[in-house]
Amino acid sequence: MEKLSTAASLFGVVVAATALAMAVVGGEAAVVEQTFMVHEMNVTHLCNTTKIYVVNGRFPGPTVDVTEGDTVVVHVINRLPHGLTIHWHGVRQMRSCWADGAGYVTECPIHPGGEKTYRFNVTGQVGTLWWHAHVTCLRATINGAFIIRPRDGKYPFPTPAKDVPIIIGEWWELDLIELDRRMLDGNFDDNPLSATINGKLGDLSNCSGTVEESFVLDVKRGESYLLRVINTALFSEYYFKVAGHTFTVVGADGNYLTPYKTDMVTVAPGEAIDVLMFADAPPAYYHMVALANQPPPPDLQIPQLTSRGLVRYTGAAMDSNNLPMPMPVMPDQHNTMPSYYFRRNLTGLALPEQQQRHRVPAHVDERLLITLGLGSICRGGNTTTCKRGRSPETVVVATMNNVSFHHTNATALLEHYYDGTPEGVYTEDFPVRPPRPFNYTDRELIPAGPLEAALEPTAKAMRLRRFRYNASVEIVFQSTTLLQSDSNPMHLHGYDVFVLAQGLGNFDPKRDVEKFNYHNPQLRNTVQVPRGGWAAVRFLTDNPGMWYLHCHFEFHIIMGMATAFIVEDGPTPETSLPPPPPEFKRCGTNGLSQP
């Protein structure tokens, strides 16, 4: 983690910058309280000074460290010239949708100079989640780990000597607000300069012969370490390896997994993967590497992004005897198959007290097939008659079932829903299937041409989907090759979903339903839909409110690969969305300025 020393005076008066646990008696639940001061800071990397946005003078930001059952209270003070919200990524927010922190979906941004208190409970979840800004591209630097520890202190795996967040991100020299504006206008020529591990660029990056600082993990031979690997990047999925070591994957997205041994972890934007690493190598220095993968040409290409850190054994000397330090052998950056096979090998692990929560709904009330890809809308208000195929007459947008989400910059959708005022704001007719079937994974559709041009026209609208309380919903996400062949990390706020199966090619219900895992599927809040493939998920709508569904590639969400699910109230007050809490500021009092 990079601490910015020039911020010291700013925080001299902030006494609540670290967690305050109150009234913990006999293992009872506590109130864990923190203050997030959000501000600008100048940081120098690669011989250039860049203005970034941080919390409490740190990049990444402070860790929220709680125990299952605790109440979390975070006071956010916005010293930025832009509005922002904080999203608690993966927290179920049972009956606390008002605290989800999705900008313009559950709340309006905290205006410059404003404050907001988030208050919610973390019941029934254990493991690694994270938090991040949820307005524009600010999450690139406004983010941090969110750790939920078991109430009884016991794990279904050997207790590690230490646990360490490994936060993979990206270093952007361009101002993040300007980056957002460019992408909104269809300009995707900007790229990060480097990957980062816990805010460090690593010694592969240098300027004028001066190498960048690397993240260093100190270990003692014979001990095990729980690495909480989180991908906060805007653009890329990452491969992560440590030379001379193997991992045992034990959890993901705040849920336990059946232990799975591997020498490499793949983590997509939005995901959090828990792995045990046993320090059993000869004492020395070993490189850890985070390498971004990307589809091969003809997809648009970005520069290779890599960050390199170190695992340093106690007693190991940095001298000529252990140089060069061992390097892990990484896959080719264009080989995305290791990502697919890594996820196919993961299964869920339900503890005895979790059996009910881990029971897959046997029946299905609603089925959706959602295609994920690119399309275009005409510039200048011309709705249909414009030249397609990456023409300057069009803006390229991201779509779900040929609908590109029209992001609002006015009153939050949750307020409209709660007040019963959706007219003229949103409709509830998000399509349950694409408007017309085609060969979704035909690589001939990647380059612009007449084949894909006929499929480009897209509706720009705010079309949501409503579900009754306690309905069983099955979604098949289908990646397409329209103008690109990216994977798609799909994140559903307020829910964990059972990942029943993943596959390559076009989903075929006659063939692929037989592959569904009803016995021990993963529970995830972010599902990586493979490049040129599909993922099938199922969940029970047991959490009333307005819940954002979107791809976690930032360029996809800005381009419109999103919608929201409305879950109706249940039959009792305990199964209904409560009124907004006293600390919730309605949009009229919270500021409406779009950053």
UniProtKB/Swiss-Prot annotation:
GO BP annotations listed: lignin catabolic process
Record key words, sorted: Apoplast, Copper, Glycoprotein, Lignin degradation, Metal-binding, Oxidoreductase, Repeat, Secreted, Signal
The protein's name in its UniProt record: Putative laccase-18
Binding sites annotated in the UniProt record for Cu cation 2: H89, H132, H552
EC number: 1.10.3.2
Reactions mediated catalytically: 4 hydroquinone + O2 = 4 benzosemiquinone + 2 H2O
Organism per entry: Oryza sativa subsp. indica (Rice)
Function: Lignin degradation and detoxification of lignin-derived products.
Family indicated by similarity: Belongs to the multicopper oxidase family.
Record InterPro entries: Cu-oxidase-like_N (IPR011707), Cu-oxidase_2nd (IPR001117), Cu-oxidase_C (IPR011706), Cu-oxidase_fam (IPR045087), Cu_oxidase_CS (IPR033138), Cu_oxidase_Cu_BS (IPR002355), Cupredoxin (IPR008972), CuRO_1_LCC (IPR034288)
